[in-house]
Amino acid sequence: MQNKNIYIASDHAGFDLKTKLLKNFPKINDLGTKTDESVDYPDFAHKLTKEVLKNKKNVGILICGTGVGMSIAANRKKGIRAGLANNSKIARLIRKHNDANVLVLP
């Protein structure tokens, strides 16, 4: 039986928040970006969704400026249910009621 893995990725706008989260949760697998230099967010949404889809237990966190771009890019993949949340209540609800496997943060 495979273990659950948690993946995180961001574009440049989400880099600072991602860095803070990784300091508090060091077991999360960081898929980039590694700097705050400008990058294309769909590249990182693709990397993360590819990993999440490898195991039904896997989940991911995507971070960008508004969260909308990452949500759209992630939800293009069959089997991905990405939900945008700007507070903990919404984050819990999209996981519980919508079975989201990717949390998107602005």
PLM region spans:
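A short beta-strand-loop structural module common to alpha/beta enzyme folds
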Residues: K27-V39
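Helix-adjacent hinge/juxtasegments
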Residues: L48-L84
